[in-house]
Amino acid sequence: MSIITDVYAREVLDSRGNPTLEVEVYTESGAFGRGMVPSGASTGEHEAVELRDGDKSRYGGLGTQKAVDNVNNVIAEAIIGYDVRDQQAIDRAMIALDGTPNKGKLGANAILGVSIAVARAAADYLEVPLYSYLGGFNTKVLPTPMMNIINGGSHSDAPIAFQEFMIMPVGAPTFKEALRWGAEVFHALKKILKERGLETAVGDEGGFAPKFEGTEDGVETILKAIEAAGYEAGENGIMIGFDCASSEFYDAERKVYDYSKFEGEGGAVRTAAEQIDYLEELVNKYPIITIEDGMDENDWDGWKALTERLGGRVQLVGDDFFVTNTDYLARGIKEEAANSILIKVNQIGTLTETFEAIEMAKEAGYTAVVSHRSGETEDSTIADIAVATNAGQIKTGSLSRTDRIAKYNQLLRIEDQLGEVAQYKGIKSFYNLKK
């Protein structure tokens, strides 16, 4: 009765109005699962391939009909007849069917849509929540949210090189309270921006994109918003994080970090050593607990030097650096580069490989941060993954836009369902830092 009888994909739109895939999986029993696939703006060069049509006459070349056809005509034929509960076998079958190291034949977007839909159909068949199906009886940790309240870089038109300025309510007692703290700071920030005559339009991930005078102006304004909302900045309250997305402004030919790409003529040009010095300066000055992609994705020497300098004090997250890939993560662990991995399901393409990356990170003492993409949908699977794996941290945007709020609302439901079992670890989620 749990045998897959039908698999169907269609083209839908993501939060940026670009095409993406939605996949449905059906079983003999009538159990059903649906998965929707996100898409990134700043992407690592080593990510699994997101298959696009390239037909400029349709969606500017971003159509996904090829990936849809691959699901309906190739993948469906291969997995119909499988037991929907056999996630690993199905994921491995799709990987083998593709046959390329980066899922470039069928498309990681095609494969991921099926992988998510299969898991949801299995949970539906067993009549259990998705997080419980994926994580088992030990599922209990609600993630500390990284809330991206200011967007820069490739996520907005704001003249700031760093892509995200985030707040983390590490001192909150529960996830529900953490969400409230974040929302109140977000609204306080909006008021401050209006008073300064700055724009309050939001970027791709729901954060504001004002024309600040620079990075420090952005941080100082966030600190004022934290205070205005009635909270304190620091380990007992709310801490700050960056996604530098350094690969977006790294000049490989000159081997420099060229901030002028986003900040104009006044933007600094820094060597790797100067980039590390600058990040350390910010950490010394402000209550910063996490920095994502502080160095270029191919600057391994820079990453090792940054980790040696700041790795005991700050969570150093590899996103473009690791691309949710166990091969790159294994090298990072061996070379002591970074101390955390960002987990994006569409960077690798299956739930099986996603869970393997999280497990490898934890075994090495690295933290794992489950993350959305800038092009999202109403699919809230990453919320369930964060809880199922007890990852301890989630990054899913600001406190606006339904595509972001859908994940937060799902986490509220899960916290309610878990009841007294639920744990919110806050500052303890950063378990590999020296306090």
UniProtKB/Swiss-Prot annotation:
Claim: Ribonucleoprotein is one of the keywords in the record: no
SMART domains: Enolase_C, Enolase_N
Residue positions binding (2R)-2-phosphoglycerate: 163, 344, 373-374, 395
Recorded GO CC terms: cell surface; extracellular region; peptidoglycan-based cell wall; phosphopyruvate hydratase complex
Domain of life: Bacteria
Keywords: Cytoplasm, Glycolysis, Lyase, Magnesium, Metal-binding, Secreted
Active site (UniProt): 205, 344
Gene Ontology MF terms: magnesium ion binding; phosphopyruvate hydratase activity
Pfam families xrefs: Enolase_C, Enolase_N
Localisation per UniProt entry: Cytoplasm; Secreted; Cell surface
Any single biological process term in GO: glycolytic process
Catalysed reaction equations from the record: (2R)-2-phosphoglycerate = phosphoenolpyruvate + H2O
Pathway noted in the entry: Carbohydrate degradation; glycolysis; pyruvate from D-glyceraldehyde 3-phosphate: step 4/5
Cofactors (names): Mg(2+)
Residues holding Mg(2+): 243, 292, 319
EC supergroup of this enzyme: lyase
Cofactor note: Binds a second Mg(2+) ion via substrate during catalysis.
Keyword Transcription regulation: no
EC number: 4.2.1.11
InterPro entries: Enolase, Enolase-like_C_sf, Enolase-like_N, Enolase_C, Enolase_CS, Enolase_N
SUPFAM superfamilies registered for this protein in UniProt: Enolase C-terminal domain-like (SSF51604), Enolase N-terminal domain-like (SSF54826)
Job description of the protein: Catalyzes the reversible conversion of 2-phosphoglycerate (2-PG) into phosphoenolpyruvate (PEP). It is essential for the degradation of carbohydrates via glycolysis.
Family according to the record: Belongs to the enolase family.
Protein name: Enolase
Source organism of this protein record: Streptococcus agalactiae serotype V (strain ATCC BAA-611 / 2603 V/R)
Taxonomic classification: Bacteria, Bacillati, Bacillota, Bacilli, Lactobacillales
